[in-house]
């Protein structure tokens, strides 16, 4: 069974509903993040979900928050069920609510969000490859190496920010100069440097586990001292492209641990961008298997 919506009967106020997460206010300082099993492709959310997807994303994010803790503070307050439920109203421990929250919930501290998607690309693929083929630029910036092939590694990872769109709208790629206009030059520079540092640390670790992190998206907030804090989800198959190092081959697109099964199925059935679509059960199962494969490879733990 998958959980595509949560309903806490108003015990906590629902303040936001994203493509995957339902966000509730716990008190004036803290939020409850609940990762549902919703999945979207081509900016449309499917009517059914991938069983346990939200749990896998949550546990993988917790792993990476812990791994990156020497590099940056994060917004986690409580990340295991015992700690989470201890900070919630006792009524939410009733089975009706507990079954919606177990294994997929985090309590996080509120921060002032920096309104940028901090995207870091280590390998040339997707929209970056299309742009490079046409103009030898990525994100409007000339690339030094004019002989890159699809899926090649960049000489050094590059920061390519985008706007943070409301649900139902598209994130828009922007230049670093435009990003600096939105958040200020100082914060923009800090975000760029930190995002590349975090990506590089994670990429090097994942390579040891047989996973290539081709690119990823970070989100940051600011604490009371105007210091950067890592927020949202971190280095999951929803926010990153993960490739299998064993099958990696320059010069072509790579199979990734993400929504590719779903995208391919939608395309084959002419359902791109259509609302109200339910996945075939087989697609949901195959997608879950990919998420688990990524989780197990990176964490070294079996998914129970």
Curated annotation (Swiss-Prot):
**Keywords of the record:** ATP-binding, Ligase, Nucleotide-binding, Purine biosynthesis
What's a BP term from Gene Ontology annotated to this protein? 'de novo' IMP biosynthetic process
Pathway named in the protein's UniProt entry: Purine metabolism; IMP biosynthesis via de novo pathway; 5-amino-1-(5-phospho-D-ribosyl)imidazole-4-carboxamide from 5-amino-1-(5-phospho-D-ribosyl)imidazole-4-carboxylate: step 1/2
Which enzyme class, named as a word?
Answer: ligase
Q: Name one GO molecular function term.
A: ATP binding
The EC number of this protein is 6.3.2.6
Q: Does the keyword ATP-binding apply?
A: yes
Catalysed conversion reaction: 5-amino-1-(5-phospho-D-ribosyl)imidazole-4-carboxylate + L-aspartate + ATP = (2S)-2-[5-amino-1-(5-phospho-beta-D-ribosyl)imidazole-4-carboxamido]succinate + ADP + phosphate + 2 H(+)
Alphabetical list of SUPFAM superfamilies matching this protein: SAICAR synthase-like
The record's Gene Ontology cellular component field reads:
cytoplasm
What does the similarity note say? Belongs to the SAICAR synthetase family.
Q: What is this protein called?
A: Phosphoribosylaminoimidazole-succinocarboxamide synthase
């Amino acid at each position: 069974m998958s959980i595509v919506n949560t309903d806490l009967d108003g015990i906590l106020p629902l303040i936001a509903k994203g493509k995957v997460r339902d966000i509730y206010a716990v008190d004036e300082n803290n939020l409850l993040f609940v990762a549902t099993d919703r999945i979207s492709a081509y900016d449309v959310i499917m009517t059914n979900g991938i069983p346990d997807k939200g749990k896998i994303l949550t546990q993988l994010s917790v792993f990476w928050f812990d791994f990156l803790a020497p590099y940056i503070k994060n917004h986690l307050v409580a990340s295991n069920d015992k700690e989470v439920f201890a900070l919630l109203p006792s009524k939410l421990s009733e089975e009706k609510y507990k079954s919606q929250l177990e294994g997929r919930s985090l309590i996080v501290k509120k921060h002032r969000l920096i309104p940028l998607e901090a995207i870091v690309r280590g390998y040339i693929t997707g929209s970056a490859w299309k742009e490079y083929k046409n103009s030898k630029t990525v994100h409007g910036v000339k690339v030094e190496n004019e002989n890159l092939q699809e899926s090649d590694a960049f000489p050094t990872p590059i920061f390519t920010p985008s706007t943070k769109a409301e649900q139902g709208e598209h994130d828009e790629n922007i230049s670093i100069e435009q990003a600096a206009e939105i958040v200020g030059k100082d914060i923009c520079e800090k975000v760029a440097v930190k995002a590349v540092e975090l990506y590089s640390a994670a990429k090097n670790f994942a390579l040891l586990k047989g996973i290539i992190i081709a690119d990823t998206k970070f989100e940051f907030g600011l604490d009371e001292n105007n210091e950067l804090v890592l927020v949202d989800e971190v280095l999951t198959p929803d926010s990153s492209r993960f490739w299998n190092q064993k099958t990696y081959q320059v010069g072509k697109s790579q199979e990734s641990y993400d929504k590719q099964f779903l995208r391919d199925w939608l395309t084959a059935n002419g359902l791109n961008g259509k609302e109200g679509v339910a996945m075939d059960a087989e697609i949901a199962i195959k997608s879950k298997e990919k998420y688990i494969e990524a989780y197990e490879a990176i964490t070294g733990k079996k998914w129970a």
